Amino acid sequence: MSRYVLQHHHAPDECGVVFTSFKGHRSPLRHQMTLTSCRSGGHEVWWTVDAASVQEALRLLPRYVAERTTVTRVSQVEIP
């Protein structure tokens, strides 16, 4: 398993579509807290997920959201 950050960006008028799209998608990300910048005008959402591949990480998202999401493989390091 690898860890990924999923960074999604959408237009201000798409917030409702993004969040509603999860209702028809089975995902462990539903009903979980995550970081967003919608209320401050940024209209981005970030998730940190563990998955076997980039494709598996994107499958956690509804297609509409996944198509507007970048995936970055990350790891934790201790800052000296």
Annotate each PLM feature.
Residues 1-80:
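Conserved, structured core segments of small domains
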